[in-house]
């Protein structure tokens, strides 16, 4: 009994000194992935992020936290790449910049990319030529819209790309995108590969769906849970044919 008492007193002493047990106050704080993701995606909420993660987790038979970590890994990697590109272009990584260049004309079905900020995050923006002198894109203010090519302001070092499919497939993809004019914008990038092709969509989802449905190709270069603008420009199917200075 005396031995047990001594051991108990020793353990208590270690606990009080922090030598054996880690108290809750000192425990490593678990990253709140949903809140951090929502902060990088203005227009979404942590609850929406959690709901999306839960749905995918059930489909893939994994824990919700596994999906949240994947969401977080993809969006923070994209942010790091966006900050790198912004620095190379001389843009402030604190955001608030606006483009000073105009898009050139290009062939129907070609795409363009420009750096673009939201909440201090250079997520980039992509759109598609619906005609030589028109583009179709999805933006927060209007959703999917079609405008004149020279109505779109872009940043220095923006690019125009061609997609490695037939002319008829590019035409079909562009026509499909135009048919979606009027659809609302979606701020959800982390899970946009898993949402429907109809309804709300962001810029990269619009192009990804168009080429998936009408050309049978996946222009998402890494095949993650979300397709981001730069996932498209780094695809093996896309080739830069012009850089705008």
Curated annotation (Swiss-Prot):
Q: Keywords on this record?
A: Signal
Task: Note the InterPro entries from the entry.
Answer: Papain-like_cys_pep_sf (IPR038765), Peptidase_C92 (IPR024453)
Can you name this protein? Answer: Uncharacterized protein YycO
Read off the SUPFAM superfamilies from this record.
Cysteine proteinases
Task: Name the species this protein comes from.
Answer: Bacillus subtilis (strain 168)
Residues in the signal sequence: 1-27
């Amino acid at each position: 009994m005396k031995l047990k008492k001594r051991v108990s007193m020793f353990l208590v002493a270690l606990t009080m000194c922090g030598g054996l047990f880690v108290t809750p106050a000192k425990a490593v704080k678990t990253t709140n992935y949903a809140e951090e993701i929502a902060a990088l995606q203005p227009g979404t909420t942590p609850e929406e992020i959690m709901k999306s993660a839960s749905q995918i987790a059930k489909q893939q038979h994994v824990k919700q936290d596994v999906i949240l970590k994947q969401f977080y890994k993809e969006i923070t990697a994209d942010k790091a790449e966006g900050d790198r590109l912004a620095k190379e272009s001389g843009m402030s990584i604190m955001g608030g910049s606006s483009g000073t260049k105009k898009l050139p004309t290009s062939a129907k079905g070609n795409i363009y990319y420009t750096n673009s900020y939201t909440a201090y995050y250079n997520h980039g923006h992509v759109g598609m030529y619906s005609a030589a002198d028109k583009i179709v894109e999805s933006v927060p203010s209007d959703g999917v819209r079609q405008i004149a090519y020279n109505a779109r302001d872009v940043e220095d070092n923006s690019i125009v790309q061609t997609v490695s499919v037939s002319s008829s497939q590019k035409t079909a993809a562009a026509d499909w995108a135009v048919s979606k004019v009027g659809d609302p914008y979606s701020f959800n990038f982390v899970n946009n590969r898993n949402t429907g092709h109809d309804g709300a969509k962001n810029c990269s989802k619009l192009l990804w769906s168009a080429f998936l449905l009408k050309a049978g190709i996946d222009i998402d270069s890494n095949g993650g849970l979300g397709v981001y603008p730069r996932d498209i420009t780094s695809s093996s199917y896309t080739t830069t044919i012009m850089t705008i200075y």
